[in-house]
Each structure stands twice: as structure tokens, then as C-alpha cells.
């Protein structure tokens, strides 16, 4: 595959400035797709798998204008141009009948759009977040879905040709203030539009009926105990709220952060100014040391207001997140009108509920990474695992080795996606992230891979390898055979210096060491390395059945684990491989390989170790949630369905003793080889991350059908707030 950087500047400029006119995307060479600024397609367009639409979205990352007017396409599929930030203008097919859900989500440079008269349906959130869209023309009478044109802050004019208002949802144009957008309709139809659902918003704020929150329909994760007092008087929430800390002179002073979080949450939901001088409802925050778990809390709603008690500030915070969902209710509006009197007693099933993101493959800008944290907290996820290095890039500043980010923080492309990525995190940014996450009671766990998945470092320091070969940064998926050399003293010096700086940056008790996919065949490059052979002889490794290389990896790991555990007081973590015959005391292993979870759990029990459950069939969120869902890649992917994630049993059927003595937590992984924008990370994560949160939190979780009912309110709230998620469930 040709790389963009190998093309001359003249070729880039000439190719980019010329419009590409073809029947379909297969008529364009990869470099033409990567550099096309203008596209015109005239043939029959495919919509499934590695389709014409997938290629336009993912491979034509510089394209600004697209003309599909003469294309043979009746369906614009779901997510067709999802978060394609460079797109400024598109002419839709003349024969188009449907526009899928989130088809133009967050196309924030799109400035105008005309919906042809042939279109019969516009899906939910189809144009949500197109903040530069100023002109919208609808020529026919399509049915318009929920939040289809929501959050269009730049919209100035909407023109319609139909005298009969197209059927719309009350939320279709959410965010438009009455009188702020010029609505041009056929003469004589003004009154019809003023009365029509969805369209009346252009003239006056829509009236939505009063709602009393029903916690049985809106809470995720579901609390362990929820008792709603039927018949008791409900509390009107649209009044003054007074936030009170029960023990200001003692333990209560540690709740300053939770007070600020409560104030922000009430302001966002209710809009009222919290004023302690006015009579109103009380929100009492308190510490209850009698609760068993550090994250446990109780929440009581009575005639005076809300009382939240936690074993620690973490418990109080999770109680606030539960209150936020109660105030959200059905999600039809920012806040319900009233809440019932109730009692909640809650505690987590697992101590760690983690998401892993992968900025090594696709860099996540720092502000976008920060923004991911509050959304996690809404569902009581409490750890964010950062996969900071891999074969494709090195993303964390190491002051001892500035060359790592100077030379290895640029990724030329990945497989058929020839989109360049660059960027890294400074140490100050990571400290800021840690402090920010702490406000949401989320732990930041860094990962540095070893001995495999280290090509980015090897490209800078070839002396880290057995044969000291300089290799380029990897631009494909898969496994590299270039590994760190355990027989080389510089390997230990390098890793020691890197982990020294990481230990200073990240206060977490945990550091992840990688350990997976070290070559294919595994560790093979150590077999003929003179330094590795000398080390084997020195430490008494005599086997020749390839187990000797795993023993050598154990030697390397033992040294780094001892350093982390004894010098920096960190608990090492690593991805479990079935050839690990010994798990060092105190370590946490990750059961990740699809179909091999049973072996990983047995090894944890045998070694009296703790284990994080993240098997691919339940927890790989980079996989599509359903067949045909993003990411549609050219080589195909397995499916991890929402139901599969929800069905995860953290104990894996091994009973209470395993859960108590060996289970560490549950984790969802977001490997980013095929995730091209920050918005796509949310899309791949949710709603599966919510299902994972409930699997990890709720001891006796309800049925999957019950979860889907409760998910409806969450989905509406996410659309209202402009958060993307997969709707393929």
C-alpha cells in the first residue's frame, strides 16, 4: 500500500484540486480516495459491508463536496457520513427514498442541504450536531425522526414545498428557539405548521405534559434495592434546592467535590439557582461509615427532599448519579416535573468497571479524552484504561526519551484507511486528566506494552531488539515479530526509566504491562538471538520445546513487576496468554481472548490471582454491535451484540468464592484500528458500556428485555445532549 507521505507535493496538490467523477468507489485507486476533495458518483451505490458509502466516509477524509444527484441509490444507510468533519456540501440522489439514522451526525462543516421530494423517511439524529448548517430545504413530505435536526446552532432558514406539514417528532428540531429560524412554507399553510407537532417549535416552545419520574423505567444500572412508596405525595422538583452537608465540622468536609457536582447536576437538569436562603427542597449529603462497601450508598426521597449517604465520597457521588437519572425520567425533556418518595440501597457487585481506549492507533485529542469521563460516570463506570503505545504510535511524553514523541507520534495510515494521525499527551495534560477524572471518581490506568506491540519504540531505538534492526512504524493491523530483547540490558534500562516517569504521573495503584500477542509464532525472534541464548544459559533455562521463550518472558516480567511493586508500590496488570504457566503474586490478569476465558479463570484460581473479565465475545466494543453496523471494514469483523454484553456473568458461573477471592472487575475494550473520529469512540462504546456497567454493578440484574425498556430513556437523553451511540439493537 502506498503511503501518503511518499507522494510528491505536486502530486498531492494536483490530485486534490481535481474533481473525481466515477461510477462508484471501486473505480478509484486508494491514493485517489485519500486525496479527493470533490467527488461525483454516477453509478449504482452499494450500502452493505465495505460499501460505496463506507468508503466515502472512511477513506475520503479530505472530501469537501460530494455530488450524488445522478447516482442510482434509493437508500442513504445509517451512519453514511457519520462525523465526516470536512464535508461542506452534498447533493443527494434524485431517486433517494430514505436517509438513515445518524447519517450526517456531527458533520459540523456542512452548510446547506436539500432533501429531494422522493425522500419518504429521515432517521433519528440524521443531521444532529451539524452546527454550521444554515439552510435546509425539504422538497417533499418525509417522516422525520427523533432529534433528526437537533442541535443546529447555525440554522437560519428552513424552506418547505409541501402545504401539508411533514410528520415530525416533537424533538425533531430540538434546540431551535422560537423565532430564531425563518420558516418558509407555501402560502396558506402557515396555520397548519403552527399547530403541527415538531413544526410548532419554530413559533413557540412545545408544551410537553407533566411527568412524574418512574425509577423502575429509567435507572441504569438498576440498584440492588429500590422501593417506591406508592400513594405518597410526589415532590415538585422545579423549586429552590438547598444543598446541605450533614457533618460540616467532621467527615462532611470531605464532600466539597460532591457539593459542587450536586450543584452542577441540579443546574443542568432543573435550571433553578440553588439558593440556601429560600425555602425549598433539601439535598442532604452525608457519610455513613456503617455501610459495607466503599462505593455503597443509600438514597431516600421524602417530603423534605433527598438524602444521600455514602460509605465514602465515592458512594455519595454514585448516589448523585442515580438522582440525576431519576430527575431525567423518560428523557422526553431535560427534567421531570416531580419525583416519587422512595428508598434505594445500593452497592456494586464488582469493584472495578472499566473502559479501555486506544489513542495509540487513533489519537484522541486531549479535550475529547476529558469529555469521555463524565459520560462514563453517569453509569457508574470507575476506571479509564489508556492504551498509550503500540506498533502504530507512542502517545505519552517521556522526558528521558523525547525522541519517542518527536519521531513516533505520527501514524501514516491503517490498512485501507490512509488517514494520517499525529499527536501525543504531555505529562502535564495527563496530570490534569487524572485530577479531572478524580472529581468523577474514575481511576486513570496507563498501559505500556511489552515485549510485543512495541514497534513505535523500536522504530526510534532499534537497540531494544534482538537484531537491532530499525523498522518503520506499522501501518496495518496484526502482530509484529519485532519484540523487546530480554537479553539486552538497555531493555531494562529503557523500561525502568519509562515506568519511573509513569509512576510519578499516574497516582493509580495500577499499571498495565501489556504482554499479549508477542509475535507469531509467539516469542520466535528470541530463539536465534545470541543475547537471549546467553541469558537462558545464565539463568538455567534448558528446555528446547519453545517453553524456554515463555520462561524468558517470565524472567523479563519478574524484573519489571518487582520494580513496580517494590519501588513504586504499584500493582502490575497484563493481558493473559494461555502459555503463562505462572502468574506472579499480586498481579491482575485480563481474560480477553475469545473462547479462552475458562482457561484464564482457572489459571487465576490456581495462582491465587485476581482477574479482569473482558472476553471478546462480550466486551470487545470495537467490534460492530450488529451485522452491518460500524465499523464496516474491508476485512470483516465478529459481532459483539448488546445482548451478549448484557449477558456477561462476572463470576462466569464459578460461584461466590471465585467472585470474592479472584474477580477484580469487568472491562470493555475500544481498540481503535478502525475508529476514525472521537465521535466514533462514543458510538462504539454505547450502549454496550451501559450494559457492561449493569453487569458489573447489579448483583441480580433484571432480564435483557427489562434493560431495553430502561434503555429507551437513556437513549433519548443521549440524543438530546448530542451524544452518539449505536442504534442497532
Annotated model-derived regions:
Residues 79-80, 100-103, 123-128, 146-148, ...:
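Consensus positions within tandem repeat domains that build extended binding/scaffold surfaces
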Residues 572-578, 582-729:
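Flexible, acidic glycine-rich loops studded with aromatic residues
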Residues 209-351, 572-576, 713-729:
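Acidic, contiguous N-terminal accessory segments
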Residues 291-510, 526, 559, 667-672:
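Feature activates predominantly on carbohydrate-active enzymes
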Residues 37-47, 62-75, 85-98, 108-121, ...:
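Structural signature of tandem-repeat unit edges
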Residues 20-30, 214-222:
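Boundary/junction segments of secreted and surface-exposed precursor proteins
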Residues 1-21, 210:
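Bacterial Sec-dependent N-terminal signal peptides
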Residues 457, 462, 473-587, 594-597, ...:
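Active-site neighborhood of glycoside hydrolase catalytic domains
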Amino acid at each position: 500500500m502506498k503511503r501518503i507521505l511518499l507522494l510528491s507535493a505536486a502530486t498531492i496538490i494536483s490530485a486534490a484540486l481535481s474533481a473525481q467523477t466515477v461510477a462508484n468507489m471501486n473505480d478509484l485507486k486508494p491514493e485517489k480516495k485519500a486525496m479527493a476533495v470533490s467527488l461525483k458518483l454516477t453509478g449504482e451505490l452499494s450500502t452493505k459491508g465495505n460499501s460505496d458509502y463506507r468508503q466515502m466516509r472512511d477513506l475520503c477524509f479530505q472530501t469537501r463536496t460530494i455530488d450524488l444527484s445522478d447516482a442510482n441509490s434509493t437508500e442513504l444507510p445509517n451512519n453514511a457520513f457519520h462525523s465526516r468533519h470536512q464535508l461542506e456540501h452534498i447533493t443527494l440522489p434524485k431517486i433517494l427514498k430514505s436517509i438513515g439514522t445518524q447519517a450526517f451526525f456531527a458533520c459540523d462543516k456542512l452548510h446547506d442541504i436539500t432533501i429531494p421530494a422522493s425522500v419518504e423517511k429521515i432517521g433519528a439524529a440524521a443531521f444532529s450536531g451539524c452546527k454550521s448548517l444554515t439552510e435546509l430545504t425539504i422538497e417533499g413530505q418525509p417522516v422525520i425522526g427523533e432529534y433528526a435536526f437537533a442541535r443546529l446552532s447555525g440554522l437560519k432558514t428552513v424552506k418547505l414545498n409541501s402545504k401539508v406539514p411533514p410528520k415530525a417528532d416533537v424533538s425533531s428540531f430540538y434546540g431551535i428557539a422560537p423565532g430564531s429560524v425563518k420558516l418558509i412554507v407555501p402560502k396558506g399553510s402557515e396555520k397548519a405548521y403552527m399547530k403541527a407537532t415538531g413544526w410548532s417549535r419554530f413559533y413557540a416552545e412545545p408544551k410537553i405534559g407533566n411527568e412524574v419520574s418512574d425509577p423502575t423505567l429509567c435507572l441504569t444500572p438498576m440498584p440492588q434495592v429500590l422501593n417506591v412508596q406508592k400513594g405518597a405525595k410526589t415532590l415538585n422538583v422545579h423549586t429552590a434546592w438547598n444543598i446541605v452537608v450533614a457533618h460540616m465540622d467532621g467527615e462532611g468536609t470531605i464532600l466539597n467535590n460532591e457539593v459542587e457536582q450536586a450543584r452542577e447536576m441540579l443546574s443542568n437538569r432543573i435550571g433553578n439557582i440553588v439558593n440556601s436562603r429560600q425555602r425549598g427542597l433539601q439535598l442532604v449529603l452525608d457519610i455513613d461509615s456503617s455501610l459495607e462497601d466503599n462505593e455503597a450508598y443509600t438514597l431516600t426521597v421524602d417530603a423534605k427532599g433527598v438524602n444521600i449517604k455514602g460509605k465514602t465520597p465515592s458512594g455519595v457521588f454514585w448516589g448523585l448519579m442515580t438522582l440525576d437519572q431519576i430527575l431525567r425520567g423518560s428523557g422526553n425533556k431535560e427534567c421531570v416535573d416531580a419525583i416519587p418518595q422512595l428508598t434505594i440501597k445500593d452497592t456494586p457487585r464488582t469493584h472495578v468497571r472499566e473502559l479501555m481506549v486506544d489513542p495509540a492507533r487513533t489519537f484522541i485529542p486531549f479535550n475529547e479524552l476529558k469529555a469521555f469521563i463524565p459520560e462514563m460516570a453517569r453509569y457508574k463506570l470507575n476506571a479509564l484504561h489508556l492504551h498509550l503505545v503500540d506498533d502504530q504510535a507512542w502517545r505519552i511524553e517521556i522526558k528521558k526519551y523525547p525522541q519517542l514523541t518527536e519521531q513516533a507520534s505520527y501514524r501514516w495510515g491503517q490498512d485501507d484507511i490512509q488517514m494520517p494521525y499525529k499527536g501525543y499527551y504531555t505529562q502535564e495534560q495527563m496530570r490534569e486528566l487524572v485530577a479531572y477524572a478524580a472529581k468523577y471518581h474514575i481511576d486513570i490506568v496507563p498501559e505500556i506494552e511489552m515485549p510485543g506491540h512495541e514497534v513505535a519504540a523500536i522504530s526510534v531505538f532499534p537497540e531494544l531488539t534482538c537484531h537491532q534492526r530499525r523498522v518503520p512504524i506499522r501501518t496495518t493491523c496484526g502482530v509484529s515479530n519485532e519484540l523487546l530483547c530480554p537479553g539486552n540490558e538497555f531493555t531494562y534500562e529503557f523500561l525502568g526509566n519509562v515506568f519511573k516517569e509513569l509512576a510519578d504521573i499516574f497516582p493509580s495503584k495500577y499499571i498495565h504491562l501489556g504482554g499479549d500477542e508477542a509475535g507469531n509464532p509467539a516469542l520466535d525472534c528470541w530463539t536465534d538471538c545470541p543475547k537471549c541464548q546467553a541469558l537462558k544459559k545464565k539463568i538455567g533455562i534448558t528446555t528446547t520445546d519453545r517453553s524456554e521463550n515463555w520462561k524468558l518472558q517470565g524472567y523479563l516480567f519478574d524484573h519489571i513487576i518487582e520494580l513496580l511493586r517494590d519501588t513504586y508500590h504499584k500493582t502490575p496488570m497484563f493481558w493473559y496468554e494461555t502459555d503463562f504457566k505462572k502468574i506472579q503474586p499480586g498481579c491482575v490478569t485480563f481474560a480477553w481472548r475469545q473462547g479462552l476465558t475458562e482457561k484464564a479463570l482457572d489459571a487465576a484460581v490456581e495462582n491465587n490471582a485476581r482477574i479482569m473479565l473482558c472476553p471478546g465475545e462480550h466486551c470487545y466494543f470495537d467490534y460492530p454491535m450488529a451485522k452491518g453496523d460500524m465499523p464496516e471494514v474491508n476485512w470483516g469483523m465478529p459481532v459483539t451484540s448488546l445482548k451478549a454484553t448484557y449477558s456477561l456473568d462476572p463470576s462466569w458461573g464459578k460461584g461466590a468464592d471465585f467472585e470474592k477471592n479472584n474477580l477484580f472487575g469487568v472491562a470493555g475494550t475500544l481498540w481503535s484500528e478502525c475508529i476514525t473520529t472521537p465521535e466514533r469512540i462514543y458510538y462504539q462504546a454505547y450502549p454496550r458500556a451501559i450494559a457492561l456497567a449493569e453487569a458489573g454493578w447489579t448483583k441480580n440484574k433484571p432480564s435483557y428485555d427489562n434493560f431495553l425498556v430502561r434503555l429507551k430513556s437513556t437513549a433519548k437523553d443521549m440524543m438530546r445532549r448530542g451524544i452518539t451511540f449505536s442504534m442497532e439493537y
